[in-house]
From Swiss-Prot:
Pfam families, A to Z: Sigma54_AID (PF00309), Sigma54_CBD (PF04963), Sigma54_DBD (PF04552)
Family matches, as InterPro entries: RNA_pol_sigma_54 (IPR000394), RNA_pol_sigma_54_core-bd (IPR007046), RNA_pol_sigma_54_DNA-bd (IPR007634), RpoN_core-bd_sf (IPR038709)
Gene Ontology cellular component list: DNA-directed RNA polymerase complex
Superkingdom of the organism of origin: Bacteria
Short motif (RPON box): ranges: 431-439
Signal peptide coordinates: none
Protein name: Putative RNA polymerase sigma-54 factor
DNA-binding region: 342-361
Function: Sigma factors are initiation factors that promote the attachment of RNA polymerase to specific initiation sites and are then released.
Organism whose genome encodes this protein: Clostridium kluyveri (strain ATCC 8527 / DSM 555 / NBRC 12016 / NCIMB 10680 / K1)
Keyword annotations of the record: DNA-binding, DNA-directed RNA polymerase, Nucleotidyltransferase, Sigma factor, Transcription, Transcription regulation, Transferase
PROSITE patterns for this protein: SIGMA54_1, SIGMA54_2, SIGMA54_3
A single MF term (Gene Ontology): nucleotidyltransferase activity
Length: 453
């Protein structure tokens, strides 16, 4: 009886652990899952990666390259290299694709017609530029650390400021913007005053206040503001700074073949896991009880993981299958055909819990004929429409708001209330607060912020 009770408890515990892992993996993004699997591969010796044919070919290539490296090319040159002897090797072949900001700056310093002492000081300053392109040292610190004069430190910092990208080596946003203005050969004092004192007013479109303070025309103040807005607040933008860029990879591809849609799961996102055969032999043949117990524990953990990854894939697939069924018009014709669709609706139709659907779409993406789409964006709340039995998608309303704003008179932009009235005239029932909410979600300023003088 005790044995049966213990067995039942162990089975329940195992089931609980498996369910917890399943839930945990389901809500992970593909990137988070990759990191988790890599960690498990390091910690669990029973886990192994199933080698694909592509991996084997790449492995063979690497082994072949190693063999070639050890060959005596003096003896084999007439057989192994058939490049035209007159063909020039481009120096660009040896340039790294990811040239860092600091490397780019150092190259410019080396090309300057300055003595080696000044170049060395400039190289030191470059090493103290952060990932944004800002200098983290004051002139006094440079003087003190390098034991140089005030004039020499200032001269070298000015040299850094003359480099590209413009604005490099500034200590703060205002200095960064002013360096860029100087590079444009502009010396209008009011622009510098606006940068020093009125950046917040520029952001809030309060050009009437700025114009009054500077005793200039409102239109002129706005033109200066427009110029300032074209400047980069982050000089390092576009350069490799040592941080890896994470690109979005879709969890699945939605492909239309003839008149039917197919869901192709992206299996490249996670390694194909298997059980290392060596550890299977230990369980079957080893007499060391501790070793067998350890391997069994790790084996159960590995099997839980493999099963949970398969369950994650299956759940996402099933949810996508239902989405494609409901949103066929969206996939065929575009955003304006997106139907209102809720988590509850999907869950109910699949006999699945709403929280499971929520986890299945969290931070997941699909690739469709118009690009990569976040699955969550396909779930919209509905607004009542007097002209249709179906609700109108919030995305359709957002498109209407954006279209109205794009076509408005810039000198007399539409208020949220006016947009609300116009949308209601089209037969869609919506409040002013909802208009404001959707406008802000699209990153569009209020009528006050959009006004042109």
């Amino acid at each position: 009886m005790d044995f049966a009770l213990n067995l039942t408890q162990e089975q329940r515990l195992a089931m609980t652990q498996e369910m917890q892992l399943s839930i945990k993996l389901l809500q992970m993004s593909s990137f988070e899952l990759q990191e988790y699997v890599e960690k498990e591969l390091q910690e669990n010796p029973v886990l192994d990666i199933k080698e694909s044919n592509v991996d084997k070919v790449e492995k063979d290539k690497l082994e072949y390259k190693e063999i070639i490296k050890n060959l005596d090319f003096d003896n084999y040159s007439h057989h192994s290299y058939d490049r035209n002897p007159d063909e020039e090797v481009s120096p660009f072949n040896f340039i790294s694709e990811e040239k860092s900001l600091k490397e780019y700056l150092k190259d410019q310093i080396r090309d300057l017609d300055e003595n080696q002492c000044i170049k060395t000081i400039c190289l030191y300053i470059i090493e103290n530029i952060d990932d944004r392109g800002y200098l983290i040292l004051e002139n006094e610190e440079i003087e003190e650390e390098l034991k140089i004069s005030k004039e020499l430190a200032a001269y070298c910092v000015d040299l850094i400021h003359s480099l590209e990208p413009h604005g490099i080596g500034a200590r703060n946003l205002a200095e960064c913007l002013k360096i860029q203005i100087k590079q444009k050969d502009m010396d209008e004092e009011n622009i510098f005053i606006m940068i020093d004192k009125y950046l917040e007013f520029i952001a809030e479109n309060k050009y009437n206040v700025i114009a009054k303070e500077l005793n200039i025309d409102v239109k002129q103040a706005q033109e200066y503001g427009d110029l300032i807005k074209t400047l980069s607040p982050k000089p390092s933008r576009g350069f490799y700074t040592g941080e890896s860029v994470r690109y979005i990879s879709p969890d699945a591809y939605i492909k239309k073949i003839d008149s039917e849609y197919f869901i192709i799961m992206n299996d490249d996102l996670t390694p194909r896991l298997t059980i290392n055969a060596i550890y299977k032999d230990i369980i079957n043949n080893d007499t060391d009880k501790d070793a067998v117990s350890y391997v069994k524990e790790k084996l159960n953990s590995a099997l839980f993981l493999i099963k949970s990854i398969q369950h994650r894939k299956s759940t996402i697939y099933r949810v996508l299958e239902k989405i494609v069924e409901i949103q066929k018009d969206y996939f065929d014709y575009g955003e304006s055909y997106l139907k209102p669709m809720t988590l509850k609706e999907i869950a109910s139709s699949m006999d699945m819990h709403e929280s499971t659907v929520s986890r299945a779409i969290r931070d997941k993406y699909i690739h469709i004929n118009r690009g990569i789409v976040k699955i969550k964006d396909l779930f919209t709340t509905g607004m009542a429409a007097s002209f249709s039995e179906e609700n109108v998608s919030s995305l359709i309303i957002k498109n209407s708001i954006k279209k109205m704003i794009d076509n408005e008179d810039r000198k007399k932009p539409l208020s949220d209330q006016k947009i609300c009235d116009l949308i209601n005239e089209e037969g869609m029932n919506i409040s002013r607060r909802t208009v404001a909410k959707y406008r802000e979600e699209m990153g569009i300023k209020s009528s006050k912020g959009r006004k042109r003088f």
